Amino acid sequence: MTQNLVTKPFLEVLSGNRQASPPMWMMRQAGRYLPEYREVRAKAGGFLDLCFNAEFAAEVTLQPIRRFGFDAAIIFSDILVVPYALGRSVRFEVGEGPRLDPLDSPDKVSTLTKAIDLSKLQAVFDALRITRRELPPETTLIGFCGSPFTVATYMVAGHGTPDQAPARNMAYQHPGAFAKIIDVLVESSIQYLLAQLEAGAEVLQIFDTWAGVLPPREFERWSIEPTRRIVEGVRKVKPGTKIIGFPRGAGAMLPAFVERTGVDGVSIDWTAEPSFVREKVQSKVVVQGNLDPLVLIAGGAALDEAVDDVLKNFSGGRHIFNLGHGIQPETPIAHVEQMLKRVRAFKG
């Protein structure tokens, strides 16, 4: 007796098959806007305690799928687990965000270990296995890492900064030392992503949250080239792996990013100019995005209009509906449902 094959819309669009109604998910879809997430977070304790408890991490990954039926689940974790697995001190202070011991001089960079200890990330891989087992068959599981540049900004400064000046200054003043950090992160990210694929991830996303602070020449060196090396390194072992890049704020550098990195899809923020993206990018790769997270808080007619704009702007090619960045904690659940209903009803 032959079973019917289950279609995964998210994987289908990344494989070249345009969907009439775009598949959708939200960055940070497992998060504080959900009461069920807050309940698990309270049980777990600290943020990293939640990341490194496989059962809890899998549970919060699954929560938005159960509630909204999104087409993709992204494993609950954080981009800074990579420096943690490189032996760096990583902690999350309440109300202050991540804190690391800064690598703010060439001498300190020389102490950076070159080999990632994947055993420190076993909980992430266990969470992927649990999640893959529990997901509906039509739902795609996404694994991820931060881009080397974005992760390096936290490692150099020891915390987040508005314009990432500490990392940029090191890249200008001590390019050899900064390149060492990037090289270590490239190799570590390749190993980490391959291990996620082995554990059940079906698609990968590379988050370059701070790419937009770089001028064009530095963007090519510190965003495009490291991403290209990661994509190449993953596919050397796992040919055909579908990979999405998110060079937030890339602007006019977006076409170069797509052309040179080899990604299958590119996520865009809400400031991207639609006609530019359609003309220069969407004919080559899947476009993912790009609803402003703040209009999702507003709701009402403003949300309907913004959703319609995104759908119409990218209906002529392959598109994954998403936000332009992560959902905000104060977002009403009813507004997510409003957005979801409108996207599902669209037939491009």
UniProtKB/Swiss-Prot annotation:
Q: What is its EC number?
A: 4.1.1.37
| Molecular function terms, GO-annotated | uroporphyrinogen decarboxylase activity
Q: Which UniProt keywords apply?
A: Cytoplasm, Decarboxylase, Lyase, Porphyrin biosynthesis
Classification via InterPro entries: UROD/MetE-like_sf, Uroporphyrinogen_deCO2ase_HemE, Uroporphyrinogen_deCOase
Q: Name one GO biological process term.
A: protoporphyrinogen IX biosynthetic process from glutamate
S-S bridge residues = none
Pathway of this protein?
Answer: Porphyrin-containing compound metabolism; protoporphyrin-IX biosynthesis; coproporphyrinogen-III from 5-aminolevulinate: step 4/4
Q: Which Pfam families match?
A: URO-D
Q: Could you tell me what reaction this enzyme catalyses? A: uroporphyrinogen III + 4 H(+) = coproporphyrinogen III + 4 CO2
Sites annotated Transition state stabilizer: 78
Can you quote a single GO CC term?
A: cytosol
Q: Where in the cell is it found?
A: Cytoplasm
Do you know which SUPFAM superfamilies this protein is assigned to? UROD/MetE-like (SSF51726)
Chain residues that bind substrate:
28-32, 78, 154, 209, 325
The UniProt entry's sequence similarity note says: Belongs to the uroporphyrinogen decarboxylase family.
Quaternary structure and interacting proteins, as annotated: Homodimer.
Biological role stated in the UniProt entry: Catalyzes the decarboxylation of four acetate groups of uroporphyrinogen-III to yield coproporphyrinogen-III.
List the protein's name. Answer: Uroporphyrinogen decarboxylase
Q: What is the lineage of its organism?
A: Bacteria, Pseudomonadati, Pseudomonadota, Alphaproteobacteria, Hyphomicrobiales
